[in-house]
Amino acid sequence: MNFQENLAALDLEYLWHPCSQMQEHQNFPIIPIKKAQGIYLYDFNDNAYMDLISSWWVNLFGHNNAYISQQLKNQIDNLEHVLLASFSHKPIITLSQRLCQLTGMDKCFYADNGSSCIEIALKMSYHAHFLKNQTRRKKLFLSLSNSYHGETLGALSVGDVKLYKDTYTPLLLKNLITPVPKNDSEIENSLNALKRLLDKHGEEICAFIAEPLLQCAGNMHIYSAKYLKQAVLWCKQKNIHIIFDEIATGFGRTGSMFAYEQCGIKPDFLCLSKGISGGYLPLSALLTHNEIYNQFYAPYEENKAFLHSHSYTGNALACACANATLDIFEKENVIEKNKALSEFIFSALQNALKPLIERQVVSDLRHLGMVFAFEVFLQTKERLSLAVFKKALKKGLLLRPLNNTIYLMPPYIITHEEIKKAIAGLVEAIDELKKAENK
């Protein structure tokens, strides 16, 4: 047993991995990673893997980014962490100012992961309505079908991915779900369904929560800004807060700094995480407006304070990484560069996948900014997503398909040559799985 194999065995003895059926790893070992650089991960046998999903959508500017790493080192020599109740620090003050200036919002409230950020948004929305009218509480939330907002109980309550949700249904908050349009031809029907729901329950709804334009865990479903604009307008008319979950879509992933910018809508609450620290350290931020903040601003004796906290809220090291990430956006004109890179990747995929599309092995190739996805149809002995994952790893590619959906969400620093190599390996993997169908 070599060092890599020994580590993998120790891992299985002591670790319980997220979103995993651990029994599968008895025959398919965990891969311990020794180091990473750029888009590559390296195991202890020096095998390299292209990180084509940005390590669960968090890594924007490559692993071991020289600038972010240096800013982290600078910060760790001064302050690693301090409680955020009654204390503060320069990195979080700077970050809060920058985020508010970027979004036109007024206040930031911090946590350390996306699900917690959603929980804060739900609580804050409910609490704000409660403070405005204590005798008539709004008790429901509204979300879109096929949505995903995290895996804590509140976040699961407003999601609609059954794989994560069904087991815990008896524990969840009551929530209303309205159909997201599957394509532009369904916009009118989806809006009509929403109108009926709002006519019946509008006065009971605290907030409408949505992932603007792109439902990532919902098989990378892209939907129309036209639908979202009208949905938000009707909700606002009913005094329903708007929560935009940009945990996965924020920081340039959809082609603009934030996806909601493409809709001409500003939410009451904006949830950010994942790419906020460049993939270095856990951090999330909920942004809101003074209109909300001022409802909680009162003498202590009035019991209006928003009493929510996490031990590592606003960690100084994470905030230093987040500021470094924003520096890169500012200095390197990332959004404009990504537009050209996005078109190059999509064109390369169109050309490479054309034979597979003609053979009806692949369909529905789509993209939004730096997100690329398509459906694949294969008969495999094990579930399709696992078969693709394993085959891709043999090609040196890290993918994590969602059911039949293969997607790419690479770091923004990926080069044209790396793209060509990755797509060639991806096509080879699909071809080999197709050829193995009848064996």
UniProtKB/Swiss-Prot annotation:
Cofactor(s) needed for function: pyridoxal 5'-phosphate
Pathway in which this enzyme or protein is active: Cofactor biosynthesis; biotin biosynthesis; 7,8-diaminononanoate from 8-amino-7-oxononanoate (SAM route): step 1/1
Chain positions with N6-(pyridoxal phosphate)lysine modification: K274
Reaction catalysed by this enzyme: (8S)-8-amino-7-oxononanoate + S-adenosyl-L-methionine = S-adenosyl-4-methylsulfanyl-2-oxobutanoate + (7R,8S)-7,8-diammoniononanoate
Residues annotated to bind pyridoxal 5'-phosphate: G114, S115, D245
Subcellular location: Cytoplasm
Highest taxon listed in the record's lineage: Bacteria
EC identifiers of the protein: 2.6.1.62
Pfam families given in the database record: Aminotran_3
Single GO MF descriptor: adenosylmethionine-8-amino-7-oxononanoate transaminase activity
Claim: Transcription regulation is one of the keywords in the record: no
Site, Participates in the substrate recognition with KAPA and in a stacking interaction with the adenine ring of SAM: residue positions: C19
Enzyme type, top EC level: transferase
Keyword annotations: Aminotransferase, Biotin biosynthesis, Cytoplasm, Pyridoxal phosphate, S-adenosyl-L-methionine, Transferase
Residues annotated for substrate binding in this entry: W56, Y148, K274, S309, R400
GO BP annotations listed: biotin biosynthetic process
Subunit composition and interactions: Homodimer.
Function: Catalyzes the transfer of the alpha-amino group from S-adenosyl-L-methionine (SAM) to 7-keto-8-aminopelargonic acid (KAPA) to form 7,8-diaminopelargonic acid (DAPA). It is the only aminotransferase known to utilize SAM as an amino donor.
Assigned protein family: Belongs to the class-III pyridoxal-phosphate-dependent aminotransferase family. BioA subfamily.
Protein name as catalogued: Adenosylmethionine-8-amino-7-oxononanoate aminotransferase
Gene source species: Helicobacter pylori (strain J99 / ATCC 700824)
Lineage: Bacteria, Pseudomonadati, Campylobacterota, Epsilonproteobacteria, Campylobacterales
Gene responsible for this protein: bioA
